[in-house]
UniProtKB/Swiss-Prot annotation:
It is found in: Cytoplasm. Keywords: Chaperone, Cytoplasm, DNA replication, Metal-binding, Repeat, Stress response, Zinc, Zinc-finger. The keyword Chaperone applies. The J domain is necessary and sufficient to stimulate DnaK ATPase activity. Zinc center 1 plays an important role in the autonomous, DnaK-independent chaperone activity of DnaJ. Zinc center 2 is essential for interaction with DnaK and for DnaJ activity. One of its GO terms (cellular component) is cytoplasm. This is Chaperone protein DnaJ. CXXCXGXG motif repeats lie at residues 147-154, 164-171, 190-197, 204-211. Coiled coil: none annotated. Belongs to the DnaJ family. GO terms for molecular function: ATP binding; heat shock protein binding; unfolded protein binding; zinc ion binding. It comes from Staphylococcus carnosus (strain TM300). InterPro entries: DnaJ (IPR012724), DnaJ_C (IPR002939), DnaJ_domain (IPR001623), DnaJ_domain_CS (IPR018253), HSP40/DnaJ_pept-bd (IPR008971), HSP_DnaJ_Cys-rich_dom (IPR001305), HSP_DnaJ_Cys-rich_dom_sf (IPR036410), J_dom_sf (IPR036869). Homodimer.
Amino acid sequence: MAKRDYYEVLGVSKDASKDEIKKAYRKLSKKYHPDINQEEGAEEKFKEISEAYEVLSDENKRANYDQFGHDGPQGGFGGQGFGGGQDFGGFGGGFEDIFSSFFGGGAQRDPNVPRKGDDLQYTMTVTFEEAAFGTEKEISIRKQVKCETCDGSGAKPGSKKKTCHYCNGSGHVSVEQNTILGRVRTEKVCPVCNGTGEEIEEPCPTCHGKGTETKNVKIKVKVPEGVDNDQQIRLAGEGAPGHNGGPQGDLYVVFRVEPSDTFEREGDDIFYNLNVSFPQAALGDEIKVPTLKGHVMLSVPEGTQNGKQFRMKEKGIKNVHGYGYGDLFININVVTPTKLNDKQKSIMREFAEVSGEEITEQPTNFKERARRFFKGE
């Protein structure tokens, strides 16, 4: 019986993308998997689907199939000789794949070797104060954990596993390839048992044979003192479960720090904008200013100019790596009064006169401004 067209087997067009081919394979393999579908012919159908996907998911194999079909290239170089425009890549992967098959370079990683689980990432938002002083918070993340019912085996408790029918327990299957040197036989991991050599007879009712289940897990996280935006910590063993008895992956917690209503932060230094009145700036004053650990008095000397910056050493944030503390910088903003009463205006005029300044006061009402405008004053 002639083999069916691989594109027809997967139900895709000849110009289907890799994603479309993968999607079709997943859908069909799930439908006809021998562990799920016990109907007659399902096993053969599954083999046919697996074979079609193996070819169409590989660019070189697919190109070879598109050009030569199931039989592969016939008669070596045929009548084309070396000038027929035939690329070696059309023969199933070229010389590299061929010789790697002969000399062992094409051997695949043993799927039964214990492997560490995947690492996970969680973004945690903390307040400015929590980042400055450190704290402990509890988070809840949804992740894969070992199934408690089957203890990760994937099998129903009390049931047994059976020898894989597809590879007869070897964990590998032989696949023949057409190459420029003829047909080459290679060993590949069994697609049914994934190299274990065993099949689950009765899947676990909780995880349905996967060995893992998705749960909300609560984890306590210590927020380091002095942590800043985009910095992260690693929680060893809090990631996804390992494979074949391997260790769990890690959880990386990335921090997002909310801005403060009082301070601005640059690294370990913090900045505070202090508004002072004209008399305070001119005469000097003792002014109470906030710090991370309460208020302190700042001596503002007489004649302080707008934009002046004062520095309080080690009043900033503790370095997250333990390299001391940052500083607190206080920026002075001299506030000019917008509304003066008559007495205040009189004092200011007197001050200007004593200082030898000639002040041309600007009118505040519309009529006076209009009168001066038309008089050219």
